Amino acid sequence: MSKISVNIKGFDSQEFPKGITPLQIMNDIKGVPKDTIICKVDGQLTDLSSNLNKNCELQFMDAKSKDGHSVLLHSTAHLMAQAVKRLFPKTKVTIGPFLENRFYYDFDVNSPFTEDDLLEVENEMIKISEENLEISHKVKSRNEALAFFEKIDESYKVEIINDLDKDETLKVYSQGEFTDLCRGPHVHSTGQIKHFKILSSSAAYWRGDEKNQTLQRVYGTSFQNSKDLKKYLQMLEEQKKRDHRKIGKELDLFFFDDEVGPGLPLWTPSGTVLIDELEALAKEKETANGYLRVRTPHLTKGDLFSKSGHLDHYMSSMFSPMDVDGIDYYMKPMNCPYHHKIFANTPKSYRDLPYRISEYGTCYRYEKSGELFGLMRVRSMQMNDGHIYCTAEQFKEEFINVCNLYMEYFKIFGIEKYEMRLSLHDPEGLGDKFIDNPTLWKKTEEDVRNALKGANLKFVESVGDAAFYGPKIDVQVWSSIGREFTLATNQVDFAIPERFDLSYIDKDGSAKTPLCIHRAPLGTHERFIGFLIEHFGGNFPLWLAPKQITILPVSDKFNDYAQQITTDLRTMGLRVSCDNRSEKIGSKIRDAEMQKINIMVIVGEKEVENKTVTVRRRFIKEQKEMSLNDFSDEILSEIKERRVSN
């Protein structure tokens, strides 16, 4: 039998019989961790049961690795689907992908799952795990796969297969009596899936389209050991407490109304304070960085978005046009084309560059009803948008300056963990998902990569996630409880300057095309405020808090003094309320803490006599008597510095 050479990461290169599987190699050599669940062959995730037929690089992986964990999650989704089919045989299975630390599977069932149903499913999953069923796969032709799933009456799988090319070859994975259509890879037995939990269920639409069949989506999670599972479940409990929808309602920050429409948030006075403070911060930072403020309309003729390429590449995320005098008008999904028009409105020379403009522009994007989620996925959003038009020589410095602006914001908000993700195009999507200009893609991506490296900024790369018009930096941040958010973006648009015939006069008198950087360091108000609510748990720092101070008279006879202090502090621009209810002071303090008011100012007989105030910080029992001037100086300084802790 012929031999192949296998270079195993962490081991010496060895020869094995052609056709051997990674699982067999695991059993042949000493030192491979027992908790290995998957492998990479020449950098590609591969089943342990796959045959190796040529010389290769082999790496064994456990579920602690990101790739290994994704495989474990995916395999647990199949385990859950098998349990559901055992308990509810008439159920139709659809799809079951993995997410970040979670998975889900969509089922077509006669009635929604109850809590008892889900507990029964979880118990059945434990039984299947204990059966330690081998998970194997076969490659089938499209017709073979179609015949198989038609025979077992899995109509959703049949629909998926019918949408594929006729010459497509498919994989099916089997474990015991259960077989699923899947690209894989998967763990090699159900016995490797031991530490899991069903989390919740909700309604979903087949293929995300509300016109299609309503399904039951069941979420779950899975980890390599019980310790990691427990830690994740504890984090989920903390997330529930900090859910921006829950806290937003408790603090009366925003709400949605059926008569207004889904995904269209209404901001209350308290929520509007958050918006105003963020805009003031952005204006301050952008002015310091040489940006000019602009304003643009909410709709436009379709011609503008045809020229920009949005109608070709972004139409599915735009609202339907409205007919005005026989012309199609669209609500804007982005501010970019308007900014290009502003740049082109007056002649520019090289002396005018870099030309930086910004605005908080309201955009409208169509999101399917099933994908809307509080402030995180909405249909109306206020975006911290801006564009920089510069020469090729200025590009690197301008791009890095935007990245540095992110760092300034993160420091202000106490965001300690973040990651820059360089999103690149996928060559297979040229002409469809991405503008068809491979030469420009290659050059622009390399320019961005070199700029990041030159500034010693750490980043990871993600193929296929670029904007249709150019590469971009997506900034991932983690809240104080460890949840990941996509927050900001810094994009290079190499197509727009030519599409809009943007130009400037260079030193030699010739017309040149500028480069365009599109940036949104704070993303949208909606998503960023949703993040901040969770990050701070609603306990906003003093400068940002909608309700900064409340004055608490200990009895009615001190109401006049309390009201005078309230008026004095308000004239200083502070957000102050006065609780002059006939309640005990302990009750007033508890109510103020429930409202997450930062500072309680207590006034009674002693304070009136001494012309002072007694100050109590949120959640701190210690109180301090101060003159009103000393108190106001202290808090105004804290607000000016935008301190995170208070």
What are the roles of these predicted feature ranges?
Residues 1-94, 100-646:
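NTP/phosphate- and nucleic-acid-binding module
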